[in-house]
């Protein structure tokens, strides 16, 4: 396998992993620990 093919597959997999983890953090069980600054703000 050529180095460019390996590099493109590695970068694609890394980006998909980061995207999947960020979606899991935003909408999954860890999202209960996130704070909402708009709810904390009082006018």
Swiss-Prot record:
Main subcellular location of this protein, as a coarse class: plastid
Organism: Cyanophora paradoxa
Key word Plastid present: yes
Residues spanning the membrane: 5-27
Gene Ontology cellular component terms for the protein in this record: cyanelle thylakoid membrane
Lineage: Eukaryota, Glaucocystophyceae, Cyanophoraceae, Cyanophora
Protein name: Protein PsbN
Record keywords, A-Z: Cyanelle, Membrane, Plastid, Thylakoid, Transmembrane, Transmembrane helix
Signal peptide start and end residues: none
Record-linked InterPro entries: PSII_PsbN (IPR003398)
Location(s) in or outside the cell: Plastid, Cyanelle thylakoid membrane
Name of the gene encoding the protein in the UniProt record: psbN
Function: May play a role in photosystem I and II biogenesis.
PANTHER family documented for this protein: PROTEIN PSBN (PTHR35326:SF3)
């Amino acid at each position: 396998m050529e180095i460019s093919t390996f590099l493109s597959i590695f970068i694609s997999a890394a980006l998909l992993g980061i995207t999947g983890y960020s979606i899991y953090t935003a909408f999954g069980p860890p999202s209960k620990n996130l704070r909402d600054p708009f709810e904390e703000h009082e006018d």
